[in-house]
Regions:
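Anaerobic metallocofactor- and corrinoid-dependent redox/one-carbon enzyme cores
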Residues: 1-174, 189-457
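Catalytic domains of carbohydrate-active enzymes, especially glycoside hydrolases
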Residues: 176-189
Length: 457
C-alpha cells in the first residue's frame, strides 16, 4: 500500500509505513548513511504530513522488524495493553500529539495511555514534535524506580558518578570517586566503565565501591559496567553489586551483536533478586543511543529514531532502575553536529518517558564531532527543564578512558541551582551531614576530595 500527498503542486509518494517514518524524521547523518533519509526539506515535510494522518492501528500493524523474526518486536507487541490500545487505535499520530500537549494529558493519564503504545507509535509522534514540544511533554511525565534509593521524583535531578581510569587502578578510581562525591555527584549511581572486562577486575572495583559506600554510609547504588555475562559471573562469585548493566539495541540482531539476548537479561534479573546487594525491586541498568543498530547492520531498513524507541520497548519489560542514552558517543557518522546531538537527546528522553522508562542522559560528544562543551551544557539545561532523571559526571568533562566529553562533576551543582532541582533526598541529607551542601546549595567544602581522607581513608 502506498501513501501520497501533494505540497506546493508537487506529488510525493511513499511505498511503506517504514519509508514514511524514516523520511518524516529530523535530519540525521546516520539516516543519510543508511539511505533512508528524506532527500530534501520539502520531502521531509510531505512525509510528516502523511505520518500525521496515519492511525495508531496502522503503526501497530507495521512494526519495524517482523514479529516472527525479532524478539524485540515480540516483546513490544506482547507487552501491549489491548484494552487501552483499543481505545486509541483509531487516533491519528496528530491526535496523539495534540493530546500529549493538552492540559488533559497529565502524569497519570499519560502513564495509562503509554501502556497502549508500541515503539513505532512513540517514535512517530516524536517526529511531529518541535524541541519545545519534546521538553514540554516530557516534563509532565515522572517515572520513578527504586534500588537502594528512589530515582525520578519531581524536582530531583540526579547524577551517575563515572570515575573511569585508564588502567582500572583502584586508588586512581577512588580519588576520582571522592572528587565526584565532593561536588554532590553520585546519588543515582557510582558506576565505572572498566578497561578490563574480566571477573577479577570487576570484582576488585565493586569491592572498593562497596567499601566506600559502607564506610561513609552513602545512600546510593554501585555498578561496574562490564559485559552482562561478566557481571553475572562476578556476582555468582560473590562480588557485591546493586545493579547489572547492559547496552541494548532495538532489534534482536542488534542485541546479539552486543553478545546477549532477552534470556540473558532474564538470568541477570533473577540473579540480582537472589544474590544482589540492593533492596530492589529495580536492579537493572541499560544504555542506548541512536545509530547502534545501523553500526551492526541490524536496523531492518528503519531510521535511527524508530530503532531507539524500540530499545525502550525492550527495556520496559524489565522495569530497570535507570536507562540513559549515550547521545553523542557513537560519533558524527550518526549525529553530525550539535544540532543533531541536542535534537537526539531531547527525542530519546521524551520517547523513553512516554514508554514508562526512568530515563537519564549522558550528554556527550566525541572529539571529531562538530560540537563542543557549550553545546553539551545547552543540552543538559534543556534536559533539566524537561525533567530528566539524571545526567553523568566525570572530572573536568573529559573521560580519559573512553576518550569522549560529557558533563563535569561541577556542572550538576550549577544546573540544580538554575532550575531549582535537588539530589535524591536521602543523598542530599548525606551531603548535608558531610558538610558538602547546606540549604540546597554547595558549601565552600565542595570540590575538596580530602574531606573523605580526613574522615576515614
Amino acid at each position: 500500500m502506498g501513501y501520497h500527498t501533494i505540497l506546493s503542486g508537487q506529488r510525493f509518494t511513499f511505498d511503506s509505513v517504514k519509508e514514511v517514518m524514516a523520511k518524516a524524521g529530523e535530519h540525521k547523518s546516520g539516516d543519510v548513511l543508511a539511505g533512508v533519509a528524506a532527500a530534501s526539506d520539502i520531502e521531509r515535510i510531505a512525509a510528516k504530513d502523511v505520518l500525521a494522518g496515519m492511525t495508531l492501528r496502522e503503526l501497530y500493524e507495521n512494526p519495524a522488524a517482523p514479529y516472527e523474526e525479532d524478539e524485540v518486536t515480540r516483546i513490544n507487541i506482547d507487552g501491549l495493553n489491548r484494552k487501552i490500545f483499543g481505545e486509541i487505535a483509531g487516533w491519528t499520530v496528530s491526535d496523539l500529539r495534540e493530546w500529549l500537549l493538552s492540559y488533559e494529558a497529565d502524569n497519570e493519564t499519560i502513564h495509562r495511555i503509554s501502556r497502549g503504545l508500541t515503539a513505532e507509535m512513540v517514535a512517530s509522534v516524536c517526529k511531529l514534535m518541535t524541541n519545545l514540544d519534546l521538553i514540554y511533554a516530557a516534563q509532565k511525565i515522572r517515572v520513578t524506580a527504586h534500588c537502594n534509593t528512589t530515582v525520578g521524583e519531581r524536582d530531583i535531578m540526579g547524577t551517575r558518578l563515572q570515575p573511569n581510569h585508564t588502567t582500572d587502578n583502584v586508588e586512581g578510581i577512588t580519588a576520582s570517586l571522592f572528587e565526584g562525591l565532593s561536588y554532590g555527584c553520585g546519588d543515582v549511581l557510582i558506576g565505572l566503565n572498566p578497561v578490563n572486562d574480566t571477573v577479577s577486575s570487576l570484582a576488585e572495583v565493586l569491592k572498593r565501591f562497596d567499601e566506600v559506600k559502607h564506610q561513609f554510609d552513602i545512600p546510593t547504588q554501585i555498578c561496574v559496567l562490564g559485559h552482562i555475562t561478566t557481571q553475572i559471573e562476578a556476582v555468582k562469585q560473590g562480588a557485591p553489586c546493586d545493579m547489572i548493566f547492559q547496552s541494548i539495541a532495538g532489534s534482536e540482531k542488534g542485541n546479539r551483536a552486543f553478545g546477549f539476548s532477552a534470556e540473558t537479561v532474564d538470568e541477570a534479573q533473577e540473579l540480582m533478586r537472589t544474590q544482589g546487594t540492593a533492596a530492589g525491586p529495580n536492579v537493572l541498568y541499560f544504555e542506548t543511543g541512536q545509530g547502534s543498530e545501523l553500526s551492526s547492520n541490524a536496523h531492518w531498513g528503519a531510521d535511527q529514531v524508530t530503532m531507539e524507541a524500540r530499545c525502550y520497548a525492550f527495556a520496559r519489560k524489565y522495569h530497570p532502575f535507570m536507562v540513559n542514552t549515550v547521545v553523542g558517543f557513537i560519533g558524527p557518522e550518526y549525529l553530525y553536529d550539535s544540532k543533531q546531538v541536542i535534537r537526539a537527546g531531547l527525542e530519546d528522553h521524551f520517547m523513553a518517558k512516554l514508554s514508562g522508562i526512568p530515563m537519564g542522559c549522558d550528554c556527550c560528544y566525541t572529539n571529531h564531532m562538530m560540537a563542543d562543551q557549550n553545546d553539551i551544557e545547552n543540552l543538559s539545561l534543556l534536559l533539566g527543564a524537561a525533567g530528566v532523571n539524571y545526567i553523568l559526571g566525570v572530572p573536568t568533562s573529559d573521560d580519559i578512558m573512553l576518550n569522549y566529553q560529557t558533563n563535569a562533576y561541577h556542572d550538576i551543582g550549577t544546573i540544580r541551582e538554575i532550575l531549582g532541582k535537588h539530589p535524591i533526598p536521602a543523598f542530599e541529607r548525606w551531603l548535608e551531614k558531610m558538610g558538602i551542601m547546606e540549604n540546597g546549595r554547595l558549601t565552600k567544602y565542595a570540590g575538596d576530595p580530602t574531606i573523605f581522607m580526613k574522615k576515614g581513608r
